[in-house]
Amino acid sequence: MNKKIALITGASSGLGFETALLLAEKGYKVYATMRNLDKQDALKQAAEDKNLNIVIKELDVTKVNSIENAVSDILKEEETIDVLINNAGAGFARTTEHATDEEMMWQVNLNLMGVMRMTKAVLPTMRTHRQGHIINISSVGGLVGQPFNEIYCATKFGVEGYTEALASYVQPEFNVKFSVIEPGGIQSEFTNNLMAHLESTGGIQDDEYLPLFQSYMGGLKENYGPGSSQTSAEVAQVIVDTIEKEDPPVRVRTSAWSEDFTRLKTEADPTGKLLQAQVKKLLGK
């Protein structure tokens, strides 16, 4: 049996980093990609320490040429890509009134278009081989809109809809599986970077929004801090468990907290399988 090949974006730290290690420990050959190779040392050392088959490559999901070059290089070495994990992304908290057009486009370009570009690049080989699994990292913010996160949530709602639509016809026709992962708070550089960005920019300066923003920041620290959120390794384990399922769910919450937080949106169809079957009827099947 040939070794399975996994491609992960945003693997320099946090969830991508931990998922790369776990999959390699399971016997996968992992192509762990990142925008900035200056950040590769920690993953490189961890792979060497554990004698894991991890190949680190440069890939920027906001640049088509970068994606095409990386995927082309991989497919010169491998027959196909078995698993794609679209993990690269960033948080952003700002009111619509205060966000610049450049900031809004940056979020869409990274969090949503990055997923679409990567899927477009990898799906052809999966379809040709009639097998594969594409994992898109979303958030509870892809199901429930949250204060000061409307721009971030809009990108994650987009990831949810994109995944759901592909699962409705590509999966049953070509045996390419799709799952969207919906964590709550993760103790990672993602959260740390968001908090640092908020603090460095002074948060929300508008007097009318300021009291609301201060309350939000208190809740953010409470819900996303140690003890009330998951570690990157815990969420990575959920991802690996999902990949190993014969018939994986379309939607995957990663904790009891995320299940509870999204229950009003998900309780009628927790796995997304019922909706997948319903939408499939649009194909006349």
What kind of feature is each model-predicted range?
Residues 12-14:
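Conserved glycine-rich cofactor-binding loop
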Residues 52, 73-84, 92:
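A glycine-rich helix->loop->beta "capping" turn
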Residues 58-69, 101:
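The beta1-alpha1 cofactor-binding region of Rossmann-like NAD(H)/NADP(H)-dependent oxidoreductases
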Residues 95-96, 100-105:
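Substrate-binding pocket helix/loop in short-chain dehydrogenase/reductase
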Residues 119, 155:
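Active-site helix of classical SDR
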Residues 139:
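Residue(s) in the substrate-gating loop at a strand-loop-helix junction
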Residues 171-248:
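SDR active-site lid
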